[in-house]
């Protein structure tokens, strides 16, 4: 009889512990707020995938390959990402191509000072253009046209003019084929160009539509200053 009582006590204790465990799990499930996926500041950026052109050929691109999930604010070693949604027949994209290329070269540390060191000494910022085809009459793009726009080569036409004659130098950042609008729809992009700054952990840090008075470079400088990531002169 004594043995049965002890067994009952042990069973009862185990049941109570198990019950407390499940209560704790349920509590965490209801009190932990997962970061929402979206394109507003503070949200986790949606997936961005496709075949990319890097100047030499087309290879697979996955934005997750650029992310560092354990990155923390203030860590200067993390690599940031600027995403541009564009259309090779978009006149505004053509207008911005020169300045955007210069900004990309600066923050990607391609631009050099007279002594040969990078002009920008802060965190590395990678740039990617997701090239789509808007549902607008006269907007017809192709991989050949994307290459022509990026490299300023070939005889493809961009917005009625030769792509090779657009303002600025050839771009050094990658272009992703989004002709089918898959990325554009995933990100709910209303029009082009649209710009986003993504933190190393994949969180949206800046959206141009929320800061129309700022350019991409302004947004980067402000964010780096706020996070203590501006290099010492």
What does each of the following model-derived ranges do?
Residues 90-94, 195:
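The canonical Cys-X-X-Cys-His
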Residues 78-81, 86-89, 134, 191:
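Short pre-active-site segment immediately N-terminal to redox-active cysteine/selenocysteine motifs
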Residues 94-166, 179-186:
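Structural microenvironment flanking redox-active thiols in thiol-disulfide oxidoreductases
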Residues 47-81:
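A short beta-strand-turn-helix
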Residues 166-171, 176-228:
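Thiol/disulfide oxidoreductase modules built on the thioredoxin-like
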Residues 74-77, 119-122, 167-169, 188-191:
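Extracellular/periplasmic catalytic domains that process cell-envelope and extracellular macromolecules
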Residues 1-61, 206:
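N-terminal targeting signals for export/organelle localization
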Residues 52, 86-89, 104-111, 224-228:
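Sec/Tat-exported extracytoplasmic proteins
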């Amino acid at each position: 009889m004594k043995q049965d009582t002890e067994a009952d006590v042990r069973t009862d204790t185990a049941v109570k512990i198990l019950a407390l465990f499940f209560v704790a799990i349920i509590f965490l499930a209801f009190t932990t707020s997962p970061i929402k996926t979206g394109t507003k500041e503070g949200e986790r950026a949606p997936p961005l995938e496709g075949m990319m052109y890097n100047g030499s050929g087309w290879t697979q691109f996955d934005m997750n390959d650029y992310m560092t999930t354990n990155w923390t604010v203030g860590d200067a070693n993390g690599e940031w990402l600027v995403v541009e949604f564009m259309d090779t027949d978009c006149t505004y994209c053509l207008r911005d191509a020169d300045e955007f290329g210069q900004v990309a070269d600066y923050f990607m540390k391609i631009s050099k000072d007279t002594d040969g060191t990078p002009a920008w000494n802060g965190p590395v910022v990678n740039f990617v253009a997701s090239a789509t085809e808007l549902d607008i009459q006269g907007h017809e793009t192709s991989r050949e046209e994307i290459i022509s726009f990026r490299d300023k080569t070939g005889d493809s036409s961009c917005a009625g003019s030769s792509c090779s004659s657009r303002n600025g130098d050839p771009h050094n950042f990658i272009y992703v084929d989004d002709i089918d609008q898959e990325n554009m729809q995933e990100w709910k992009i209303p029009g082009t160009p649209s710009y986003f700054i993504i933190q190393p952990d994949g969180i949206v840090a800046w959206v141009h539509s929320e800061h129309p008075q700022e350019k991409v470079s302004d947004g980067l400088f402000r964010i780096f200053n706020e996070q203590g990531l501006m290099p010492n002169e």
